[in-house]
Amino acid sequence: MKIELQKWSFEDKETLITICNSIDRSYLAGRIPNPYTEESADWWLNMVGESDGKNAVFRKIVADGKIVGNISVEQKEDVYCKNSEIGYFLLPERCSKGIITEAVKKICEIAFQELDVIRIRGRVYEPNIASRKVLEKNDFSLEGVLRNAVFKNGEIYNLCMYGKLAGDRANG
């Protein structure tokens, strides 16, 4: 399977809406509107256009020519300005196929080249074993667990904090 990361464009809006209304939100933060509307997509695509390459890298994940998800690395501010955070989501039917593992490898390379950062962090709800494995396969280190740190849908979760430094071994 050929995995590519490509820049988002307004021509992708309908696909973005479809994906965002199809994803499993069990372990996602609440920042992605639900339902995901045309207005949501317009706002987000404008923000991506303004931020990409400056303080963030946003890419659509393309598997065998089809857009199947999103991945991003966003630079932090103030005293955390050399840090960034990775986030991703994928169509449910494309999970467990190695797509996200490859996409994380690629986005980390891009982020360390394009952004003025030395560190990428990943925050994962403790029961999200698949996402934890994705980060670990890409040389992210488990740096700690924040106990009872997340409250979502009436449940309390521990939050696993992962980190990858620019000098950490490349996956592969």
Please give the residue ranges for each predicted region.
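Acyl-donor (CoA/ACP) binding surface of acyl/acetyltransferases
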Residues: 1-15, 19-22, 61-172
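Residue-level marker of structural boundaries
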Residues: 22-25, 34, 50, 167
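Secondary-structure transition/hinge residues
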Residues: 24, 28, 49-53, 94, ...
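Conserved GNAT-fold acetyl-CoA-binding loop/helix
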Residues: 25-46
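A short helix-loop-beta-strand connector motif used in the catalytic cores of GNAT acetyltransferases and
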Residues: 46-60
